[in-house]
């Protein structure tokens, strides 16, 4: 009998614990580093901070944003509660896609990336094909991109 493990469900308690710990550490450090430069903040931060929290706090100090730390700490637990950990995806096509095509693309993106919010756009200059953006990844399978690639190869020869 095959079992399916829901990795996201298994990881949820870990993610919740990490976010809670990060929020607590940010809240505790906020008054200590308020108004300090990054080098001054580094000197007063506790050694037992999560490395990511330490780096985040130093970046906030460097950018002069320590006044926003309490708001950031308050927002962290909300990522789990509101489900806002979903990935945003954008699909651009040369023509309007049918409901069936959109459903298939959404399903495939969800299989690959988990919780995905997909928005669809039409850009006739693509000529054909799709451009799919998920987070910072871009898959440009448009006819416009293919023709541009052929043009670059021909110009290089």
Curated annotation (Swiss-Prot):
This is ATP synthase subunit delta. Belongs to the ATPase delta chain family. InterPro entries: ATPase_OSCP/d_CS, ATPase_OSCP/dsu. It is found in: Cell membrane. Its main location: membrane. It is a peripheral membrane protein. PROSITE patterns: ATPASE_DELTA (PS00389). It comes from the Bacteria. GO terms for biological process: proton motive force-driven ATP synthesis. The lineage of its organism: Bacteria, Bacillati, Chloroflexota, Chloroflexia, Chloroflexales. F-type ATPases have 2 components, F(1) - the catalytic core - and F(0) - the membrane proton channel. F(1) has five subunits: alpha(3), beta(3), gamma(1), delta(1), epsilon(1). F(0) has three main subunits: a(1), b(2) and c(10-14). The alpha and beta chains form an alternating ring which encloses part of the gamma chain. F(1) is attached to F(0) by a central stalk formed by the gamma and epsilon chains, while a peripheral stalk is formed by the delta and b chains. GO terms for molecular function: proton-transporting ATP synthase activity, rotational mechanism. Keywords: ATP synthesis, Cell membrane, CF(1), Hydrogen ion transport, Ion transport, Membrane, Transport. One of its GO terms (cellular component) is plasma membrane. It comes from Chloroflexus aurantiacus (strain ATCC 29366 / DSM 635 / J-10-fl). PANTHER family: ATP SYNTHASE DELTA CHAIN. Disulfide bonds: none annotated. F(1)F(0) ATP synthase produces ATP from ADP in the presence of a proton or sodium gradient. F-type ATPases consist of two structural domains, F(1) containing the extramembraneous catalytic core and F(0) containing the membrane proton channel, linked together by a central stalk and a peripheral stalk. During catalysis, ATP synthesis in the catalytic domain of F(1) is coupled via a rotary mechanism of the central stalk subunits to proton translocation. Pfam families: OSCP. Signal peptide: none annotated.
